[in-house]
A protein has these predicted regions:
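TPR/TPR-like (Sel1-like) alpha-helical repeat modules
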Residues: 204, 208, 214, 218-249
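Helix-start (N-cap) detector for alpha-helical repeat units in TPR-like alpha-solenoids
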Residues: 44, 78-79, 112-113, 146-147, ...
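Structural signature of tandem alpha-helical TPR/SEL1-like repeats
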Residues: 57-66, 90-103, 124-137, 158-171, ...
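Alpha-helical segment of the N-proximal tetratricopeptide repeat
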Residues: 40-79, 83-93, 120-124, 154
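Terminal, low-structured helical/coil segments at or just beyond the last alpha-helical repeat
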Residues: 26-40, 232-274
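Structural marker of alpha-solenoid helical repeat scaffolds
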Residues: 73, 107, 141, 175-176, ...
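Long, contiguous interaction/recruitment modules in multidomain scaffold/adaptor proteins
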Residues: 1-42, 56-57, 62-69, 273-274
Length: 274
C-alpha cells in the first residue's frame, strides 16, 4: 500500500493557516511601490488560505487556480509553492509538481515536507531511486516521521531491497503502533519470501487495528485460502470486496505494491465461486 497523495495536500493546507502576514517592503523602495507590493502579497496569502480551505474539503479543482495565482502574488513564500506543487501532484501533473516543489525548496531548503512531496512525485513516475534519495533527505530533517519512514520503506520494497524495507516499516510502526499500512506491507514482503504464516500474522495484526481496511483483509483471505482454510478465506474475500470493490482489480493491487506471488494466487482466488 503506497501513501495517498492527498495527505500531502491536507498537511500543507493545515500549515497554511499559520502563515504570517505579508512583510512590508524595504524602506528604500518608493512609498507607492511599497503599498502595492505589500497589498499584492497579502492578497496572495489570502488566496493561498482559500485554496487550503478548499483542499480540506477535497475541492482540488477549485483550489488549483487560487494556488497558482497565489504564487504569482506571493512568489517568495515557500509554503504557497508547496501547496501548488502538492495540488499538481494530486492531479498527476508531475512535471508541474516538481517545478513548483523545486521552487519551494529553493526558498526553504530545510522543509522536509517538500522533500517528501518530491519523493512522492518521483515515486509516482517510477523514478524509485530518485524517490529514495528524496525520502532519505527528508528524514534527515524529520527523522521520526512515520509517513516518511513508510514511504522510504515502499521505495526499498519496489527496488526489491526487502530487509531495508522491513527495517523502515518497523521504524514507522515504532513511531505509531496503529500504523497498519506499514504492518500490511511487511506482510506483502513475507508472502513474496514464501513465509505465509508470517504474512498471515502481519495481516491479522493490521485487521485487528482497522477491521474496515479492505487491503489486509483481502490479503489475509488469499493467504488463508492458500494455506487450506478455504471457507474462511472466501468469507473474508467477500467482506473485503464489500468494503472496497477496487481490490478485485489486479492492476489496482499492483499499484498497491502487491508482489508477483501474491498477485498470481489472488488472480486464481478471485475466480473461485462460492
Amino acid at each position: 500500500m503506497p501513501k495517498k497523495v492527498c495527505l500531502i495536500s491536507f498537511l500543507v493546507a493545515c500549515s497554511l493557516w499559520s502563515m504570517p502576514r505579508a512583510a512590508q517592503a524595504q524602506a528604500l523602495i518608493p512609498h507607492v511601490l511599497q503599498l502595492n507590493t505589500a497589498q499584492l502579497e497579502k492578497q496572495g496569502l489570502s488566496l493561498a488560505q482559500e485554496a487550503a480551505q478548499l483542499v480540506q474539503f477535497q475541492q482540488f479543482e477549485l483550489a488549483l487556480p487560487r494556488a497558482r495565482l497565489a504564487t504569482q502574488l506571493a512568489p517568495n513564500n515557500d509554503k504557497v509553492w508547496l501547496l501548488l506543487g502538492s495540488l499538481h501532484l494530486q492531479n498527476k501533473d508531475y512535471k508541474a509538481a516538481i517545478a513548483a516543489l523545486n521552487q519551494s525548496q529553493t526558498l526553504n531548503p530545510q522543509n522536509p515536507d517538500v522533500l517528501f512531496a518530491l519523493g512522492s512525485a518521483n515515486f509516482q513516475q517510477k523514478n524509485y531511486q530518485a524517490a529514495l534519495l528524496n525520502y532519505q533527505a527528508g528524514l534527515k530533517l524529520k527523522p521520526n516521521d512515520p509517513e516518511g519512514l513508510f514511504d522510504l520503506g515502499n521505495a526499498y520494497l519496489v527496488l526489491d531491497k526487502f530487509p531495508e524495507a522491513i527495517a523502515q516499516f518497523n521504524q514507522a510502526i515504532a513511531q505509531n503502533k496503529k500504523f497498519w499500512p506499514a504492518i500490511n506491507n511487511i506482510g506483502l514482503i513475507k508472502y513474496e519470501q514464501g513465509d505465509i504464516p508470517g504474512a498471515i500474522q502481519k495481516w491479522q495484526e493490521a485487521v485487528a487495528i482497522d477491521n474496515k481496511a479492505a487491503e489486509p483483509l483481502l490479503a489475509l483471505a488469499v493467504a488463508l485460502y492458500v494455506k487450506g482454510d478455504k471457507q474462511k478465506g472466501l468469507e473474508m474475500r467477500d467482506s473485503a470486496l464489500r468494503i472496497d470493490q477496487r481490490y478485485a482489480d489486479l492492476d489496482f493491487l499492483k499499484q498497491n505494491l502487491w508482489g508477483t506471488r501474491l498477485l498470481s494466487d489472488t488472480e486464481k482466488f478471485l475466480q473461485v465461486k462460492r
